Swiss-Prot record:
InterPro entries: GHMP_kinase_C_sf, Mev_decarb, Mev_diP_decarb, MVD-like_N, Mvd1_C, Ribosomal_Su5_D2-typ_SF, Ribsml_uS5_D2-typ_fold_subgr. The lineage of its organism: Eukaryota, Viridiplantae, Streptophyta, Embryophyta, Tracheophyta. Homodimer. The gene is MVD2. It is found in: Peroxisome. Its main location: other. Its EC number is 4.1.1.33. It comes from Panax ginseng. This is Diphosphomevalonate decarboxylase 2. Signal peptide: none annotated. Pathway: Isoprenoid biosynthesis; isopentenyl diphosphate biosynthesis via mevalonate pathway; isopentenyl diphosphate from (R)-mevalonate: step 3/3. (R)-5-diphosphomevalonate binds at Y25, W26, G27, K28, R80, S163, G164, S165, A166, C167, R168, T219.
């Protein structure tokens, strides 16, 4: 290893999106390899609005592997981080940086220590798949740093070892994670069904009901469901295989009514499995249920689905509108039913693609107060408003997969390898 005595630092920075499953992954047949009991399908969300940025660095001056998440140092000793690190280090190749005059041999990677900094631009551990983006970015960035030859499909099998849903964040657009049949998990990988441009009419509105960490982690919840729920096996064997075929067809044909019905039904069944678990798991709350009711009433009044809803392991609603016009009508309804409290300003209550507010006809907080009730609310039923039940809304769309960022986007100091 050249320049052993010099304090050089080599860094790579990557950005990876999160994803939301429309056919859910819930339950593992192997806890160590993280092998699922069913296939799943997801939509990758635009990383301009929801993503993880990770900088990985290596230097002979580093004394130990260290990691910082959202500015706070965390332990890298966890099994999932270590599984990914071992897999990537075993596949590392020679690296040469001609500008810095640095050569790292394949055998040197085992000796060199790493510094890693990661930042989520959305709530961590609140049911917005932050672990998916985080572990996918961890693997993608390390693979680039260590000059791996593996493609994203092969990297997805490594990311899966860190977080199951992370394997789906290595692609943009619509992604399928195959459960596989091999005991060693070699065929349990993700691949892209269609890119983000395939169905670019879709608009996604996320209602962040709670940014707090959930009481029951996904890992614990899955274990409990597999041990105690009778519904989960029926779901995995009888229901999901048919829905996977139907969802693939709906995505290929851009058939929104079928897409919406499948997404809503699968979300509801996933949460039914959680309720069928002993002790029961409550990821959704009253606000989640109110949002479902709002969407269902609207869809029924029109006669065909305008919006799909799906909830991961948390109370936050991911609402998928068939086009921008419908998305504006959706946000209009959401702002009517879930107006902000007086502490909010519009700029922080609706984030992401704020241009949709122009379509809604809302320019300030007073405009929200004057919104009329949606037409599906009957005249004889008073319109209920739930002020403060939603923390904020994120407007986004299907997005691209992971990318490398220039050095200017690094989270670590290029001289010291410590957080900026």
């Amino acid at each position: 290893m050249a320049k052993e005595l010099q304090k050089w630092v080599v860094m790579v920075t990557a950005q990876t999106p999160t994803n939301i499953a429309v056919i859910k992954y819930w339950g593992k047949r192997d806890e160590t390899l993280i092998l699922p009991i069913n296939d799943s399908i997801s939509v990758t969300l635009d990383p301009d609005h929801l993503c993880t940025t990770t900088t990985v660095s290596v230097s002979p001056s580093f004394e130990q592997d260290r990691m910082w998440l959202n500015g706070k140092e965390i332990s890298l000793l966890g099994g999932r981080f270590q599984s990914c690190l071992r897999e990537i280090r075993s596949r590392a190749c020679d690296l040469e940086d001609e500008k810095k005059g640095i050569k790292i041999k394949k055998m040197d990677w085992e000796k060199l220590r790493l510094h890693i900094a990661s930042y989520n631009n959305f709530p961590t551990a609140a049911g917005l798949a932050s672990s998916a983006a985080g572990l996918a970015c961890f693997v993608f960035a390390l693979a680039k740093l260590m000059n791996l030859n593996e493609d994203n499909g092969q990297l997805s099998a490594i990311a899966r070892r860190g977080s199951g849903s992370a394997c789906r964040s290595l692609y943009g657009g619509f992604v399928k994670w195959i459960m596989g049949k091999e005991e060693n998990g070699s065929d349990s990988i993700a691949f892209q069904l269609a890119d983000e441009k395939h169905w670019d009419d879709l608009v996604i509105v996320i209602a962040v009901v709670s940014a707090r960490q959930k009481e029951t982690s996904s890992t614990t919840g899955m274990q409990d469901s597999c041990k105690t729920s009778m519904l989960i096996q029926h779901r995995a064997k009888e229901v999901v295989p048919k829905r996977i075929i139907q969802m693939e067809d709906a995505i290929e044909k851009r058939d929104f009514p079928s897409f919406a019905r499948l997404a809503c039904a699968d979300s509801n069944q996933f949460h039914a499995v959680c309720l069928d678990t002993s002790p029961p798991i409550f990821y959704m709350n009253d606000t989640s249920h109110k949002i479902i009711s709002c969407v269902e009433k609207w869809n029924r009044s029109v006669g065909t689905p305008q919006v799909a809803y799906t909830f991961d392991a948390g109370p936050n609603a991911v609402l998928i509108a068939r086009d921008r016009k419908i998305a504006a009508l959706l946000l209009r309804r959401l702002l009517f039913h879930f107006p902000p409290t007086f502490q909010h300003c519009l700029n922080s209550y609706v984030i992401g693609d704020k241009s949709i507010l122009q379509d809604v006809g809302v320019q300030d907080m007073k405009d929200i107060e004057s919104l009329p009730p949606p037409p599906e609310i009957k005249d004889n039923i008073p319109a209920q408003k739930s002020n403060g039940d939603v923390s904020y809304f994120i407007c986004t769309r299907p997005g691209r997969g992971p990318v490398l960022l220039p050095d200017s986007g690094a989270l670590l100091n290029p001289e010291t390898g410590l957080p900026k």
